[in-house]
C-alpha cells in the first residue's frame, strides 16, 4: 500500500507534528525452542490509522535484509514474549538486533502488570480476543512446517501462515485492550 508507513520515512507518535504513529507487530515461528532450531516464519503487521497489513516471510525468504525491509517505516514494534524469545532468536539466527533498529515494547510485561499471566493464547481467552484457529498451538506450527517441507503440503503452509498472521494481528487487538500507547 503506497503511503502506508512508507519505507525510509519515520513517523512521530500521534499528536507530534500532526503525524499518525505507525505501529508494528512481530511474531515468529520456529522448528523448536533450542539454539539449534530454525526460523520458519517471520510475520510483521503494520497498523496506521485504519490501514492494517501483515507481511510474512518463510523458509529461505527469511534474511536480515528482508526483515529490516518489513520493519522499515515502523515507529515501534510490539511483541508478546519477544524480549526473551522472538528478538533473541532473530539476533542469533540472522545477526539482526531488532532493538537497535526500532523501538520495542513487549506486551507480556504489560499483561503481567495487570495480573494477566500465561502465554498469548491464554491472555487472549481471558480478554475475549477471538481467533479463527483457536485450537492451534506452537507444537502444531512446528508439525505444519515439517509437513510443508517434507511433503510439499501447501495447505499446511497456508494454515501455518494464517496461524502466524493471527498471532501478529491479535497483538494489535491486545495492545488496544491494554491501552498501551
Short names for language-model regions:
Residues 128-181:
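Acidic, Mg2+-coordinating catalytic module of metal-dependent nucleases/exonucleases
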Residues 52-127:
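Conserved DEDDh/DEDDy metal-dependent 3′-5′ exonuclease domain
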Residues 21-31, 164:
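Two-metal-ion RNase H-like nuclease active-site motif
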Residues 33-34, 86-89, 172:
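Short catalytic/ligand-binding loop motif for oxyanion handling, primarily in non-cytosolic enzymes
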Residues 37-49:
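Short conserved beta-strand segments at catalytic cores or DNA/RNA-binding microdomains
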Residues 1-20:
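N-terminal accessory regions of nucleic-acid-interacting proteins
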Residues 35-38, 116:
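Short glycine/proline-enriched turns and hinge-like loops at secondary-structure junctions
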Residues 27-29, 86, 106, 167:
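Acidic active-site catalytic centers that drive phospho-/nucleotidyl reactions
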Amino acid at each position: 500500500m503506497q503511503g502506508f508507513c512508507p519505507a525510509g520515512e519515520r513517523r512521530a507518535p500521534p499528536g507530534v507534528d500532526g503525524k499518525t504513529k505507525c505501529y508494528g507487530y512481530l511474531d515468529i515461528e520456529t522448528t523448536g525452542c533450542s539454539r539449534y532450531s530454525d526460523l520458519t516464519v517471520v510475520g510483521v503487521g503494520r497498523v496506521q490509522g485504519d490501514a492494517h497489513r501483515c507481511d510474512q516471510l518463510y523458509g529461505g525468504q527469511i534474511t536480515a535484509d528482508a526483515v529490516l525491509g518489513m520493519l522499515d517505516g515502523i515507529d515501534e514494534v510490539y511483541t508478546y514474549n519477544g524480549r526473551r524469545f522472538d528478538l533473541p532468536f532473530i539476533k542469533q539466527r540472522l545477526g539482526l538486533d531488532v532493538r537497535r533498529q526500532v523501538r520495542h515494547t513487549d506486551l507480556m510485561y504489560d499483561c503481567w502488570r495487570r495480573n494477566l499471566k500465561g502465554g498469548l493464547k491464554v491472555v487472549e481467552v481471558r480478554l475475549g480476543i477471538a481467533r479463527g484457529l483457536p485450537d492451534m498451538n506452537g507444537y502444531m506450527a512446528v508439525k505444519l512446517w515439517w509437513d510443508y517441507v517434507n511433503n510439499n503440503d501447501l495447505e499446511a503452509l497456508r494454515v501455518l501462515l494464517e496461524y502466524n498472521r493471527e498471532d501478529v494481528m491479535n497483538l494489535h487487538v491486545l495492545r488496544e485492550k491494554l491501552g498501551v500507547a
